[in-house]
């Protein structure tokens, strides 16, 4: 196995319209048994309309048993109208190649009209039996940023038997009119027998703007297809400011699940804004009735008025004091979305409210004018169960 040296590069872009592409291991050999160096790249952008690209290893395909290095890549953007993309390893990965365990900092928190993206392993696709590294990605976005994309592994698809790493992504939308798309594994679909890693995603929204937003996807920002398997992910939204309207969309696995795909056992923690939370997916297209399997997910909307879908399988909905006026859209009905007749047992956890027993709680449950059960937790907090009547609820539906 050939090992490349550990290199350090410092780059400054301080002129209008400068373009730079930096490689941690330039000229990475086209061979099947090469290990990239543990490189450090620091790039500072002060000019306007600059374009920066950083690869931890090289703009190539990682193949055979080759491995990316454990790189530290820092993009500090302080201009305006800039574009930056940071990739932990290479353009793509195939065979039994492995990504390095990279640390990426993509900071555009002091700019305007700047687009910044970061991918833990590859800019494009992972295929074969490629394995993503365990990467740590930190990003920040400022005023009117563009299509800011962050993924723990691939900027494209994951296919065949490729496997995502166990990644940590922490992205802040720091000012007005900003948005981020954050995926634990890929921006594109997971296909074939691809398997998502067990990832930890956090997005902090600036509550000083009602239009700050984030979209979090445990595995794919597009879909799980074929026999793809989602990882066991943790998604968290935080709100830093006053506007309750600043909210997020959260998908434990992907917006769409197709074929015979399988969701992971995910944990979704909403912020103080208005969140839309899907334990598995929003759209289901099973190959045959019931061929899609949902994970056993835990959804906690936090404060704010949230809407929650657990998806298939038995899920947990957790409510703490100050949880707001929330709606569970598919209580005990998630399997119907995939055409399954299997019985599920969702549970509503209200331990945080300190009810003595079922008798005390049941007195606070009644139907609204639409015939949906409403659980009145306090003067300001409630849970509405779409399509469920109060008489259909029992002590076994709750954790008290």
Please give the residue ranges for each predicted region.
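Acidic, glycine-rich calcium-binding repeat modules characteristic of RTX/beta-roll
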Residues: 1-356
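Low-complexity acidic/polar repeat-biased segments
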Residues: 362-400
């Amino acid at each position: 196995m050939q090992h490349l040296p550990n290199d350090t590069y410092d780059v400054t872009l301080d002129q209008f319209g400068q373009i730079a592409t930096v490689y941690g291991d330039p000229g990475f050999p086209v061979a099947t048994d090469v290990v990239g160096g543990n490189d450090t790249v620091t790039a500072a952008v002060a000019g306007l309309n600059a374009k920066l690209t950083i690869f931890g290893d090289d703009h190539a395909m990682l193949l055979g048993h080759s491995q990316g290095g454990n790189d530290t890549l820092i993009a500090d953007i302080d201009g305006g109208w800039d574009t930056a993309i940071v990739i932990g390893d290479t353009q793509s990965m195939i065979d039994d190649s492995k990504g390095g365990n990279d640390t990426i900092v993509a900071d555009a928190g002091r700019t305007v009209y700047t687009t910044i993206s970061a991918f833990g392993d590859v800019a494009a696709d992972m295929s074969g039996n490629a394995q993503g590294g365990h990467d740590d990605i930190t990003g920040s976005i400022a005023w009117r940023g563009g299509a800011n994309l962050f993924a723990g592994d691939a900027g494209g698809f994951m296919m065949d038997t490729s496997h995502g790493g166990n990644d940590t992504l922490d992205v802040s939308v720091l000012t007005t009119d900003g948005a981020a798309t954050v995926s634990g594994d890929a921006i594109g679909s997971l296909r074939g027998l691809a398997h998502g890693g067990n990832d930890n995603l956090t997005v902090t929204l600036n509550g000083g703007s009602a239009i700050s937003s984030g979209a979090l996807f445990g595995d794919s920002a597009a879909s799980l297809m074929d026999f793809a398997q989602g990882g066991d992910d943790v998604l968290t939204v935080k709100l830093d400011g006053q506007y309750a309207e600043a909210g997020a969309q959260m998908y434990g696995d992907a917006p769409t699940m197709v074929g015979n795909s399988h969701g992971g056992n995910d944990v979704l923690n909403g912020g103080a804004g208005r969140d839309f939370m899907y334990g598995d997916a929003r759209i289901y297209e099973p190959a045959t009735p019931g061929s899609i399997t949902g994970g056993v997910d835990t959804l906690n909307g936090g404060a704010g008025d949230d809407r929650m879908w657990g998806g298939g399988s038995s899920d947990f909905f957790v409510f703490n004091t100050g949880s707001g006026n929330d709606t569970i859209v598919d209580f005990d009905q998630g399997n119907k979305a995939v055409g399954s007749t299997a019985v599920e047992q969702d549970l509503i956890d209200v331990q945080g409210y300190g009810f003595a027993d079922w008798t005390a709680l049941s007195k606070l449950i009644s139907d609204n004018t639409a015939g949906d059960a409403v659980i009145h937790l306090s003067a300001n907090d409630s849970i509405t169960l779409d399509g469920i009547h109060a008489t259909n609820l029992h002590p076994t539906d709750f954790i008290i």
